[in-house]
């Protein structure tokens, strides 16, 4: 008895990485078969068309192989199946992970496989959605391709893997503005900011989903064949500001840093449009964030005109606060391809990649070797008084504000430019009210477990509702971390942002 592949359902984005909108795409679903001899299959470059009444589907040329190793039937609403055990690993990685040559439909798209399919005679062997080419602004349309099997043919369906081969891309074909990286990175976050053991609240947090379109050249560099029209990626902004000596500077950072950052990115956009700067991406982002922080610091100190909050055109030349007030500032820009973190002070950003924590910032402490040397070179002193302090007063070596400690305490941030990876789980931004009592690994493990536990208890939100407002699972994780910090002895204000980097999760279930 002849054996063939099982019924499968696939949602495919079928277009080149960059497509000329004037050139139509013809895509084929090729050779769904058992991968018992992968080498023979991958070397087989022939074209076939089955038209004998058994299988009727389009076959085509091959060049690039994409293997889906654990194919499952997709329900029309793409609901998330929640695992029974928190320690189980996800079967399917999130929709934000990008693969060269693949365009992924926005999770909020209404395109999906049909619930039922009518065939003239037989049963469905495979169905797939073929996306028609669109511009970024248009809603993708689709056609459903169906391969069916006649009842009168005696065949046995067996489990197998599926190899989907994409047509060879012609590098000489003109390309349009649609990019493989123009993929909606669904923002999933939760925040909390509490007084903790302090009598006054001096912290502030800010989350701005869909913050800004960033030119791909600032993320991916000058790839051959990239459109000169500078396609963009959507970024999401997150910031934690830990004030000291008062709340004025932290509050001003809350209201101003994101807009100052947007101004600097806009300036870089204009430079990229006029010419190729020749700078590396790390250098570009360092310049963007340093200029942003220095501008805000000058505004805080009354050195330059600053905008008045709530007024679009009014400017004033006056200090925001007394010169003894300052704030840390840790900021993360998250998009589908990269995470960019800037930090000034002792707040911190930590990434959970797989099961390992990765700090994306390094605390600016006076006893850090390079910071100690910089302070002494500038004529300052690091004095031990309940820990290392600049001039015996400030327990951090960099901050925004603190004019009375210039030039020993500086506002210059350090910047980390981190490409996203498939294993990325979550990102935590927090003030030292958390990090003083909890290690990076502990915080990441607690956050991940809490997110998974929330999904186990409550199920998954419909995709159309994900990314709208704060994510309840991330919110639960942030609140849980703050309670643990208090239980572990934190006496400071505690501000936390938890960002779930798995925009779409699918978990193992107990059979």
From Swiss-Prot:
Ranges for the PPM-type phosphatase domain? Answer: 188-501
Q: What is the species listed in this Swiss-Prot or TrEMBL entry?
A: Arabidopsis thaliana
Inducing factors: Repressed by MYB44. Induced by ABA.
Q: Which residues bind Mn(2+) 1?
A: 242-243
Q: How is the cofactor bound?
A: Binds 2 magnesium or manganese ions per subunit.
Q: Detail the disulphide connectivity of this chain as listed in its UniProt entry.
A: none
Which Pfam families is this protein grouped with? Answer: PP2C
Q: Where is the signal peptide?
A: 1-19
Q: Which cofactor does it need?
A: Mg(2+); Mn(2+)
**GO annotations under biological process?**
abscisic acid-activated signaling pathway
- So what does this thing catalyse? O-phospho-L-seryl-[protein] + H2O = L-seryl-[protein] + phosphate; O-phospho-L-threonyl-[protein] + H2O = L-threonyl-[protein] + phosphate
Q: What is its EC number?
A: 3.1.3.16
Question: Any keyword Transmembrane helix?
Answer: no
Q: Which UniProt keywords apply?
A: Abscisic acid signaling pathway, Hydrolase, Magnesium, Manganese, Metal-binding, Protein phosphatase, Signal
Assembly information from the UniProt record: Interacts with PYL13.
Q: Which family does it belong to?
A: Belongs to the PP2C family.
Tissue-by-tissue expression: Expressed in seeds.
Has the keyword Ligase been applied to this entry? no
Alphabetized GO MF terms: metal ion binding; protein serine/threonine phosphatase activity
The protein here is known as Protein phosphatase 2C 7
The protein's job, in short, is: Key component and repressor of the abscisic acid (ABA) signaling pathway that regulates numerous ABA responses, such as stomatal closure, seed germination and inhibition of vegetative growth.
Q: Which residues bind Mn(2+) 2?
A: 242, 432, 492
């Amino acid at each position: 008895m002849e054996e063939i592949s099982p019924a499968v359902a696939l949602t495919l984005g079928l277009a080149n990485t960059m497509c000329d909108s004037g050139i139509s795409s013809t895509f084929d679903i090729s050779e769904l078969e058992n991968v018992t001899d992968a080498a023979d299959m991958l070397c087989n470059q022939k074209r076939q068309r089955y038209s004998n009444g058994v299988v009727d589907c389009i076959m085509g040329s091959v060049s690039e192989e994409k293997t889906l190793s654990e194919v499952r039937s997709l329900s029309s609403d793409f609901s998330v199946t929640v695992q029974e055990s928190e320690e189980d690993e996800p079967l399917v990685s999130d929709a934000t992970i990008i693969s060269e040559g693949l365009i992924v439909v926005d999770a909020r798209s209404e395109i999906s496989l049909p619930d039922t399919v009518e065939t003239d005679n037989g049963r469905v062997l495979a169905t797939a959605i073929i996306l028609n080419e669109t511009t970024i602004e248009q809603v993708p349309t689709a056609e459903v391709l169906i391969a069916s099997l006649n009842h009168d043919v005696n065949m046995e369906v067996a489990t197998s893997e599926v190899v989907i081969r994409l047509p060879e891309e012609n590098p000489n074909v003109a390309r349009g503005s649609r990019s493989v990286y123009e993929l909606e990175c669904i923002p999933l976050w939760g925040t909390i900011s509490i007084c903790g053991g302090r009598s006054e609240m001096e912290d502030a947090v800010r989350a701005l989903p869909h913050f800004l379109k960033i030119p791909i050249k600032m993320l991916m560099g000058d790839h051959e064949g990239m459109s000169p029209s500078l396609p963009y990626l959507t970024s999401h902004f997150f910031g934690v500001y830990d004030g000291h000596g008062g709340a004025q500077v932290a509050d001003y950072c809350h209201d101003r840093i994101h807009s100052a950052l947007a101004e600097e990115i806009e300036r870089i956009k204009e430079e990229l449009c006029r010419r190729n700067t020749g700078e590396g991406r790390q250098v570009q982002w360092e310049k963007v964030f340093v200029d942003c922080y220095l501008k805000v610091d000058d505004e805080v100190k009354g050195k330059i005109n600053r905008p008045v909050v709530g007024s679009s055109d009014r400017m004033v030349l006056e200090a925001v606060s007394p010169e003894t007030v300052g704030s840390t500032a840790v900021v993360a820009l998250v998009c589908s391809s990269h995470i960019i973190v800037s930090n000034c002070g002792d707040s911190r950003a930590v990434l959970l990649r797989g099961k390992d924590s990765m700090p994306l910032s390094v605390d600016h402490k006076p006893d850090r070797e390079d910071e100690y040397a910089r302070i002494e070179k500038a004529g300052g002193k690091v004095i031990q008084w309940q820990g290392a302090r600049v001039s015996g007063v400030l327990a951090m070596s960099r901050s925004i504000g603190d004019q009375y400690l210039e030039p020993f305490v500086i506002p210059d941030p350090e910047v980390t430019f981190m490409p996203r990876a498939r294993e990325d789980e979550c990102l935590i931004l927090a003030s030292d009210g958390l990090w003083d009592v909890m290690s990076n690994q502990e915080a990441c493990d607690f956050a991940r477990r809490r997110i998974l536990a929330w999904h186990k208890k409550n199920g998954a939100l419909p995709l159309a509702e994900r990314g709208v407002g704060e994510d309840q699972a991330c919110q639960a994780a942030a609140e849980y971390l703050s309670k643990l910090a208090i239980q572990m002895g934190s006496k400071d204000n505690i501000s936390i942002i938890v960002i779930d980097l798995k925009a779409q999760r699918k978990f193992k279930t107990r059979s």
